[in-house]
Amino acid sequence: MQVLVRDNNVDQALKALKKKMQREGIFREMKLRGHYEKPSEKKAREKAEAVRRARKLARKKLQREGLLPMKPKPVFGAGPGGDRRGPGAGPGAGPRPAR
């Protein structure tokens, strides 16, 4: 697997490499091959994964048809460490004081 390093920017190249590896499923493969998996365990795991995929597919289909409510979209700006001052946000839940 090759990644182009532009302007000696190794951090960006590493990020691109990790993204490629993630897409290819290399990390998942490494995790699975980290220890021996008995054939019966492998069969059970693959069956569970297939059931999970089928359930997810059925849920998506029902959502598209309008029979199930859609998953709420995340509100941007209130992520980790962000400003979450809403109802019941604790003492002094008003606007943030200026610095």
From Swiss-Prot:
Location of region: Disordered: 60-99
Keyword rRNA-binding: no
A single BP term in Gene Ontology: translation
InterPro entries: Ribosomal_bS21 (IPR001911), Ribosomal_bS21_CS (IPR018278), Ribosomal_bS21_sf (IPR038380)
Cellular component, GO annotation: ribonucleoprotein complex; ribosome
UniProt keywords, alphabetically: Ribonucleoprotein, Ribosomal protein
Nucleus is among the record's keywords: no
GO molecular function terms listed in the Swiss-Prot or TrEMBL record: structural constituent of ribosome
Protein family membership: Belongs to the bacterial ribosomal protein bS21 family.
Protein name as it appears in the record: Small ribosomal subunit protein bS21
Organism encoding this protein: Rhodopseudomonas palustris (strain BisA53)
Gene encoding the protein: rpsU
